[in-house]
Swiss-Prot record:
Protein name per UniProt: Immunoglobulin kappa variable 2D-29
InterPro entries per the UniProt record, alphabetical: Ig-like_dom, Ig-like_dom_sf, Ig-like_fold, Ig_sub, Ig_V-set, IgV_Light_Chain
PROSITE patterns membership: IG_LIKE
Stretches the record annotates as Complementarity-determining-3: 114-120
Keyword tags: Adaptive immunity, Cell membrane, Disulfide bond, Immunity, Immunoglobulin, Immunoglobulin domain, Membrane, Secreted, Signal
Disulfide pairings: 43-113
Any one GO biological process: adaptive immune response
Chain segments carrying region Framework-3: 82-113
Ranges for region Complementarity-determining-1: 44-59
Top-level taxon of origin: Eukaryota
Lineage: Eukaryota, Metazoa, Chordata, Craniata, Vertebrata
Keyword flag Ligase: no
Compartment(s) where it occurs, according to its Swiss-Prot or TrEMBL record: Secreted; Cell membrane
Gene assigned in the entry: IGKV2D-29
Length: 120
């Protein structure tokens, strides 16, 4: 007779609370830049992305037209292999920035910031 109560306890343990969901907000939503000029995109998280292991799980992706998203920056400021050094990431806690020192025509696309400290 104890099984139903134990099962209910397990189910309750796995119900996510909506108040704990992390919301990511990027600004600006659209940006027009002349080639050769710098560009900056901000990303704000509703909660700190600093993990107990000391790492901050914030990533930047670029999706070029007709292509899947490609990783640019991982853990706030580390450039992924092959990413040009004109791309840089910075920030901590809840506030992050992606900077492009000199925009090139090939940089056109949709930029996303993503967290992985909390997964669905």
């Amino acid at each position: 007779m104890r099984l139903p109560a134990q099962l209910l306890g397990l189910l309750m343990l796995w119900i996510p609370g909506s108040s704990a969901d992390i919301v990511m907000t990027q600004t600006p939503l659209s940006l027009s830049v002349t080639p050769g000029q710098p560009a900056s995109i901000s990303c704000k998280s509703s909660q700190s992305l600093l993990h107990s292991d000391g790492k901050t799980y914030l990533y930047w992706y670029l999706q070029k037209p007709g292509q899947p998203p490609q990783l640019l920056i991982y853990e706030v400021s580390n450039r992924f292999s092959g990413v040009p050094d004109r791309f840089s990431g910075s920030g901590s806690g809840t506030d992050f920035t992606l900077k492009i020192s000199r925009v090139e025509a090939e940089d056109v696309g949709v930029y996303y910031c993503m967290q992985s400290i909390q997964l669905p």
